[in-house]
Amino acid sequence: DPWMRNHMPKITMYQSGGAFEQKEDAPFVQSFKKAFHDVTDTEIKVVGSPAGCDSRLWKRIAGAQVFQYGPGNQEQCHSINEYVDVEEFYKAILVYAHFILTWAQR
């Protein structure tokens, strides 16, 4: 297209984070695992996420310690008819609250 050739779009990248890794033995992660166990009386399995999320920006750009956790299951996340079980939601609230309180008291 002649017009497009003479009026190329200008693309500006305002953020980029790329992939990231958070070591499982990091104190932040270990503290969360303990909080999860304290609330649920079960161990949480640490796995990688196949989806993109803002954690990459916090880790790679801001240098923050991060992890991803939420109610529901990874296989169903961001799919058609996505939903979260109410009990899972309530459990996540308790886990978050316990983690925040115990991490803040370190």
Task: Give, region by region, the residue ranges found by the protein language model.
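Metal-dependent amide/peptide-bond hydrolase catalytic core
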Residues: D1-R106
